[in-house]
Structures are given as structure tokens and as C-alpha cells.
Amino acid sequence: MERLCWGWWWHLGILCLMHWAAGDTGSKTKSCSEVKQVYLAKGFSLNGAPQSEISGEHLRICPQGYTCCTSEMEENFANISRVEFEAKLRESSASIQRLLTTQHRNFDSYFQDLLNTSERVLQERFPSQYGDLYSQNSKIFRDLYSELRQYYRGSGINLEEALIEFWSRLLERVFKAQHTQYSFSEEYMDCLVKQYEQLKPFGDTPREVKLKAARAFIAARSFVQGLNAAADVVRKANQVPMSTECARAVMKLVYCPHCRGHSSIKLCSNYCWNVMRGCLANQADLDSEWRNLIESLLLVADKFNGASNVENIVGAIHTKISEAITHMQENKELLTNKVFKICGTPKKTNKGSKSEERRRKGKATQEDKSAVATMDNLISDVKGILSDIQDYWVSLPSLFCTEKVTAGPGNEDKCWNGITKGRYMPEPMGSGLANQINNPEVDVDITKPDMTIRQQIMQLKIMTSRLRNAYNGNDVDFQDTSDDMSGSGSGDGCNEDLCGSGRKLSRETVIIQPATHAVPRQPNPGETGKGTRLSSWDLLICLVALLVAQCTRW
């Protein structure tokens, strides 16, 4: 029996040697050449970088299995992941701002060119058409264009009152020019102006200008203000700082697979989307009011097309003024009789009348209208851009989760899921803060929305309301609603909240990910070898123990 036991021991010894040899072959550590290449490419020194995998109990963000990253490497990767994330957001934000400001500048420049051209044509033509009537009263025309510009630029001028004031002053000047043989007191002029509505000295032109030009200016002003407000919202939303929880999640998403030895595999798509939707939850809450603003801008843009477009109205203000003066000149006798009947006959002077001569000179000259499609082109461009950026806020995660970096269909089991190479089990979260309550990747406090984002949501609502009023032809008071909001920045170094041992553990590091990913248990710090090798060794020890016990009995 003793010989039999020794035989068993001999065979077990051979088995142990074979197992050790097999274990030694399987325990050969992986090379860290790939992660070192990535690390070097990011501008870091390779001093201290391991040649092969080391135990990962020092890691604070990445899974604590075997790793190619030291504490310093993990910290550097964490910092660079934050920098790259914020840089990509800034780049996207700057691109949208450029689009909006370019459209704002193009429309604003063209609209003001129309107004400037109209005034220039008036200044060139009216001296020859109306002689002293214009030269002695040119200030009222300059004042009109000045007030139109101020209104368009957002001042508190009441456009309707400005137009009424212009027509009243023009009535006084033309009536005096037509009756130079009379002397008019201030009281007489007051009587004349008070009868303006009844007399209708300029025909229907003032009413037409009030309806069409006022609507054009209201729409144009609201449109440029809306474009400016949209760009301002994008700028301020970009100032929202990256949260600590987001920074950890992005590091784990982007660089932990390198530390884990999986540099060549892609990210699990749903994993990437969950990280980004958690990080960009506050920004996604802008979506609803942003869409309302874009839709309102598109509605107002439609006002610039058709027979009553801006080119036909703003660019022809001087023509309408000329038509009004001509109408009054051609109906001089009828108007004079009505005024004298209502206000009385004024005292005569020794001056003669040149009104007939000026009336003949003052025939309205229609300006040749060139077929310019510039406004149509501008509106077509801006409508296309507005439509393209309508879903900007909810599409931000797609900046990071592109086809280039995420695994496609058929590769769901061969992607980085936050712990290892394998399938990602959790469902993708929806967009917006409220949908992040169960986000397994980013610990989001849905009860504390970002105040900068809330302020921008309110600005979007205010601007949308103004645009809707403008679309309906209602004048609105535009004040500059922009304010200098400064977002808090992030310093250098991997702070305690991000990497420190005293950090608040999120769901991703405690419960959710290991349970839902359904991956094998990772070795704890201090364990040697891999899980499968340890299990075989434990089994061998058990066999030896059983044999010893049996031999003892024998």
C-alpha cells in the first residue's frame, strides 16, 4: 500500500510539473508596446512606462486588473481625455457660432445696403426733382433713414410713431413750398397736421409704407436678433464645465482600454452613447426650446420671399416718398381748398409762387429695378443651415461616438464595454437630464440642473416669443439680452475628485457595471495569475490533499 501511495505521489509530481509548465506559458505577460505608442503620441515621456503588464491595484479610474499603465500614466491619460473632450465641444460650438454669425453678418449687411442705397438714390435724385423743397428740408429725410436704422439695430424707437412724425413734417414742408405766397403761423400748421387723416394728402402711400415697410423692418430686426441670440446661446452653453463624474467616465471610455491592453478594439456603441448622453445631459435639455427658436426663424425667413419681399420694400422707400410728394402736388388745388375751408385762409405775402414749376419737376420717377436674386439666395442659404442645426444639442454625442471608434453590427461581443472586451449589456439612455437617473456610466444628479443652461433655455423662450410676434406683424421691444457669463474652468492635474482615493464612488464603480456586463470576476490586488489558472491550481491542491488523507488511512 505504501508503494501504491508513492506511485500516486510520483504521478502527481509529474502532473504538477506539467501544470506548472503550462501555467508558466499561459502566464506570460502581454507586451505594452501599443499603449506606449499611444502614450508617446500624446506627448508624454516613456520614462517609467512598463514594458509588459503589471498588477493594477494602483489604478483609480480604470479596472484594477493587469494593466500597462502606471499611476502617472493614468493621471496623464485622465487629463488629456478631459482636454480632448472639451476641445471637441469647443470646436463644434465654434463651428455653429461661425455659421450663425456669418448668416447674421450677410443678412445684416445686405439689409443695411438696401437702406443705404435707397437713401443715396434719394439724395442723388431729389435735388433735381424737387429743388428747394428738398434742399431746404433734407434733414427730415436724413432723420427718417436714421430712425429706420436705429429701429433695425434694436433701439427703443417706436416705428409707427416715427413714420407718422415723418409724414406730418413732410406735409408741412410741401404745403409751405406749394404756397410761398402765404404766411403760415404755428397754429395754422398744427391745424393742418391735425387734419392729416381726413385730408390724406399723400394718398394711400403712407398707409402702404406703414403696413409693408413696418412689417419688413419688424421681421428683419427680429430675424437678425434671433440669429444673434442663437449664436449667443451656443457660446454660453459651451462654458458649462465638465463634471468630475463625466471626466472619469470619458477617461474610462477612451483610454482605459489602452491601459487594459485593448488598444486595437473599438468601443461598444451603446456604452459610448451612455457616457456621452450622461456627460451632455444638461446641454440636451436645450433641444426643445432650440427647435422652437429655429422653427420661428424659418417662419420669419419666409416673410422675405414673394411679391412683398424686403428688396421690393426697403430698397424702394425713396420711390414711395417720391410718389407721395407727387400725389400731393398733383392734387394741390383740391387739397388747398379743403385746408382753407377747415383751417381758414392764411395771410398773403409779397412772394410769388414757384410751386407749379416744382410740381412739373417733381413728377415721380420710377427706378429701374434690376433682377437681383441676392435676398432669395441669402434666405435660401440661411434656411438650409437652420434646418441642418435643428437637432444640434441632441446630436452632440455623435461627435464622439462615430462609426470610426464604435463597433458596428456583428461585433457587439468584440468591443470595449468599460471593463474588458465583451458585450455591453445595459440599454442606451435617452437624451436630457431626466433620462439619466439610471445611467450606469455617469453619476448624474438630475435634481441639480446647470444654471447656465437654465438661463439659456429662458433666453430661447423669450426670443422665440418675439419672433412669433414679429411673424404676426406685431412690433416688439428688443433689448440686448446678452450678458457676460463666465464658466468655471478646470485646473491642471488629476484632482482628488477625479483620481483621489477619497472620491465619491459612482454606480459604475460599485454595482451596475460588473453585474450588467456579466463578465468573469477580475483578480483582486495581490492575486497572481489569471482566474482560470488559479482555479486549476486549487483543484490540483485538493487532489493532493485527498490523496494524502487516503494514504494516511491506508
UniProtKB/Swiss-Prot annotation:
Q: List the disulfide bonds.
A: C32-C68, C62-C256, C69-C259, C191-C343, C246-C279, C268-C415, C272-C401
Instruction: Report which gene this protein is encoded by.
Output: gpc1
Compartments (UniProt record): Cell membrane
Q: Which parts of the sequence are annotated with region: Disordered?
A: 346-369
The entry annotates sugar attachment on N79, N116, S486, S488, S490
Query: What task does this protein carry out?
Result: Cell surface proteoglycan that bears heparan sulfate.
| Leader peptide range in chain numbering | 1-21
Q: How is it modified after translation?
A: O-glycosylated with heparan sulfate side chains.
Q: Please give, as recorded in its UniProt entry, the membrane topology of this protein.
A: Lipid-anchor; GPI-anchor
Q: Which organism is it from?
A: Xenopus tropicalis
Protein family membership:
Belongs to the glypican family.
Any one of the GO BP annotations? regulation of signal transduction
Q: What is this protein called?
A: Glypican-1
| A Gene Ontology term for the protein's cellular component | extracellular region
| UniProt feature, compositional bias: Basic and acidic residues | 353-369
Task: List UniProt keywords, sorted A-Z.
Answer: Cell membrane, Disulfide bond, Glycoprotein, GPI-anchor, Heparan sulfate, Lipoprotein, Membrane, Proteoglycan, Secreted, Signal
Top-level lineage group: Eukaryota
InterPro entries associated with the record = Glypican
